[in-house]
């Protein structure tokens, strides 16, 4: 569901809204501050929460601002263009715009677009685009024209796609509309023809857009009162070809058809769209929010004083010119679901109020009575019983949130246990909100850390990293290895940077901290069961490599000789190999096993593995090598225990560590012995697989000969007698 909250107005005493309203409302680098540009000479900086202006700047008499002022998110400065070609840059400390930085450009500017994580982009009327920094280096540089002279830009927008700005602008030429998509980094430009209906050419449609995968979803509000969607490819196979794009109906009859003014729309999220204009049943203008997925009107607000047909949205706030005042309307859009669209979400109802049904009762439609009055009464009683059972859950949830904000850890733990035992909530969002409340208080109060409460919530098995991204960060700050192990076991979507941070902590944390931690030891087997024969066998693996190949077989005699010629006392130094006992304590091994089981993508993990200290990399390699020897010593190639690491996981992590830290490991004497063993082992594996391939080829050849022999005997003909 979507709701429009109570509106409020901003003082517009210094602004002069022309007949077409304001030029624009743009976000600044402060979440609560916005730049409002009128259609004359003034720019005002507003702080919405205080409902008052923080500053205003005006150009000289006779000059006029020709595109909305924007904020450079990289520097915090403000940028505007007056008289089409004059660029001005200033900040909060400047008072007189005439004395701030000025640059006169060689071509007329249509608009400046500024989005976060990149520099502002200047779009010229001829369709060319330049980054602000490149433009300031040479303001009078030649600006090419990429669109025909007859075409006029009527709408434009910039999106960030994989850290690359993507510019889209719509042009109009005698009632025909064209879409241009420019990839700013690759400088590619694609042109598309928008196929609009004939009745639309007399009225300019309103546009808004969003990125949907590899397409830009261009949404237009047409003169017939319907909303249409056109999917525009971001990456075109042929940039020279003028492709024709057909639109599809998205919402039917959302405003009165034939309306010429006071109509606008903007996309709020993937499921909701805000529409400004008179509905079909009323002549007065309204602001309404529609659910795109389920084609339903969620909420609306009447605007009796009329509007300029302009609508801006930033964050969770809508801006519009209502009458002569700049009106701000906060809104909220919940996640779209079928239950929400049909009004079937759980809610409380005050006694004595009558609720209007949100859906049609098909059993009583069209004069048909399919059920008796007794059946209807039983359905009513059953529905009331269900609502009575559901009502205590929401107040209990809200009460628990208030307890989390102010009560002690012990009290929170008791109330949380009661709440989970009573209602057992199955919704991810409820558990996520509880974790967010606890983590938020942990950040505000460093001494507050309810480990038991957080553990209970994680053990509900409904959380993920994306639902509570700050939880593991708090656990890392408190060196809570128990919590981190639980998160690694439960969360399927942990980023590689966080996984590597956990690995660094597990390798560096002190034994005293591990001794006091309650760590799950199911994945660790008993290391004390190793027999003397097993130790002797592993010691002999220095001279005789596994699978029956000695060092001489792999032409590794020099390296192996150096390895075997080490003094006897070297084998007993810390960090020396081969490993005859586990190099880490059992609790540390259990933590490392949790890392081995975590999901990762190799390109994203490797850069973070390079940040691990060399001594910790060596220790981790020792442990992985020890696990590998245990695996190869088993006939099933598996380790004992509940969900232990597999051979493939062990080998993958060995390869990852060597790829990320091989140069560093070469400089460490303790790691040289391991590298030589791995080197010899890989060569022996190559040899054994080569021999196995030869045997396989021989077997295939024998099978072929046997098939030929059997076939020859099957089809032979023997002549017994001739007549």
Curated annotation (Swiss-Prot):
Subcellular location: Nucleus, Nucleolus
Sites of N6-methyllysine modification: 346
UniProt entry keywords in alphabetical sequence: Activator, Methylation, Nucleus, Ribosome biogenesis, rRNA processing, Transcription, Transcription regulation
Superkingdom field: Eukaryota
Region described as Disordered: spans on this chain: 549-572
Cellular component aspect of the GO annotation: nucleolus; t-UTP complex
Example of a GO biological process term: positive regulation of transcription of nucleolar large rRNA by RNA polymerase I
Pfam families found in the cross-reference section: Nol11_C, NOL11_N
Predominant subcellular localization, coarse grouping: nucleus
Assembly and binders: Interacts with UTP4. Interacts with FBL/fibrillarin in a transcription-dependent manner. May associate with the proposed t-UTP subcomplex of the SSU processome containing at least UTP4, WDR43, HEATR1, UTP15, WDR75.
Free-text function comment from the UniProt entry: Ribosome biogenesis factor. May be required for both optimal rDNA transcription and small subunit (SSU) pre-rRNA processing at sites A', A0, 1 and 2b.
Name assigned to this protein: Nucleolar protein 11
Gene (name only): Nol11
């Amino acid at each position: 569901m979507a709701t429009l909250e109570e509106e409020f107005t901003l003082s517009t005493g210094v602004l002069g809204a022309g007949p077409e309203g304001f030029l624009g409302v743009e976000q600044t680098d402060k979440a609560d501050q916005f730049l409002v540009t009128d259609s004359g000479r003034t720019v005002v900086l507003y702080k919405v929460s205080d409902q008052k202006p923080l500053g205003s700047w005006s150009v000289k008499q006779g000059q006029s601002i020709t595109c909305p002022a924007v904020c450079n998110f990289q520097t915090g400065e403000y940028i505007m263009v007056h008289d089409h070609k004059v660029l001005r840059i200033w900040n909060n400390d400047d008072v007189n715009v005439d004395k701030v930085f000025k640059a006169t450009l060689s071509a007329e500017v249509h608009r400046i677009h500024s989005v976060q994580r990149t520099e502002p982009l200047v779009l010229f009327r001829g369709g060319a685009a330049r980054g602000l920094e490149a433009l300031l280096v040479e303001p009078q540089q030649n600006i090419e024209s990429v669109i025909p002279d007859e075409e006029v830009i009527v709408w434009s927008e910039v999106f960030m796609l994989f850290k690359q700005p993507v510019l889209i602008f719509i042009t109009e030429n005698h009632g025909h509309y064209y879409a241009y998509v420019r990839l700013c980094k690759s400088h590619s430009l694609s042109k598309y023809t928008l196929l609009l209906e004939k009745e639309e050419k007399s009225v300019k449609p309103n546009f808004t857009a969003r990125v949907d995968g590899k397409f830009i979803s261009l949404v237009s509000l047409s003169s017939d009162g319907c909303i249409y969607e056109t999917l525009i490819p971001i990456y075109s196979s042929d940039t020279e070809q003028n492709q024709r794009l057909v639109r599809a109906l998205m919402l039917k009859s959302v405003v009165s058809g034939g309306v010429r003014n006071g109509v606008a729309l903007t996309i709020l999220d993937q499921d909701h769209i805000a529409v400004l204009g008179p509905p079909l049943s009323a002549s007065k203008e309204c602001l309404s929010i529609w659910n795109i997925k389920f084609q339903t009107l969620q909420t609306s607000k009447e605007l009796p004083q009329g509007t300029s047909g302009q609508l801006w949205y930033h964050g969770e706030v809508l801006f519009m010119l209502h009458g002569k005042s700049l009106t701000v309307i906060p809104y909220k859009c919940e996640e779209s679901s079928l239950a929400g669209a049909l009004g079937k979400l759980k809610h409380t109802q005050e006694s004595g109020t009558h609720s209007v049904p949100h859906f049609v009762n098909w059993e009583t439609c069209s004069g048909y009575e399919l059920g008796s009055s007794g059946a209807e009464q039983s359905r009513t009683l059953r529905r009331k019983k269900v609502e009575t059972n559901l009502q205590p859950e929401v107040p209990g949830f809200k009460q628990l949130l208030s307890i989390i904000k102010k009560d002690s850890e012990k009290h929170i733990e008791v109330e949380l246990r009661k709440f989970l035992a009573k209602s057992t909530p199955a919704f991810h969002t409820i558990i996520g909100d509880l974790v967010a409340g606890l983590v938020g208080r942990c950040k505000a109060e460093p001494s507050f850390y309810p480990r038991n409460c957080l553990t209970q919530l994680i053990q509900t098995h409904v959380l993920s990293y994306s639902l509570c991204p700050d939880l593991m960060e708090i656990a890392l700050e408190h060196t809570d290895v128990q919590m981190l192990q639980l998160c690694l076991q439960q969360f399927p979507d942990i980023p590689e940077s966080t996984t590597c941070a956990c690995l660094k902590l597990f390798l560096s944390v002190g034994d005293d901290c591990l001794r006091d931690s309650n760590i799950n030891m199911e994945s660790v087997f008993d290391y004390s069961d190793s027999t003397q024969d097993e130790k002797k066998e592993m010691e002999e693996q220095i001279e005789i490599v596994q699978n029956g190949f000695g060092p001489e077989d792999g032409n590794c005699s020099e390296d192996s000789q150096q390895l075997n010629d080490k003094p006897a006392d070297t084998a007993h130094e810390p960090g020396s190999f081969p490993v005859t006992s586990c190099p880490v304590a059992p609790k540390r091994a259990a933590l490392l096993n949790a890392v081995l089981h975590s999901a990762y993508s190799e390109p994203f993990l490797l850069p973070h593995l390079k940040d691990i200290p060399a001594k910790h990399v060596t220790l981790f390699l020792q442990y992985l090598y020890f696990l590998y020897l245990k695996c190869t010593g088993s006939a099933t190639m598996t380790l004992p225990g509940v969900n232990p690491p597999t051979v493939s996981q062990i080998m993958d992590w060995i390869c990852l560590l060597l790829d990320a830290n091989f140069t560093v490991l070469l400089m460490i004497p303790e790691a040289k012995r391991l590298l030589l063993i791995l080197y010899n082992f890989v060569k022996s594996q190559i040899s054994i697989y080569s021999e196995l391939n030869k045997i396989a080829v021989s077997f295939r050849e024998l099978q072929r000969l046997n098939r030929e022999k059997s076939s020859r005997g099957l089809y032979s003909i023997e002549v017994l007698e001739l007549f």
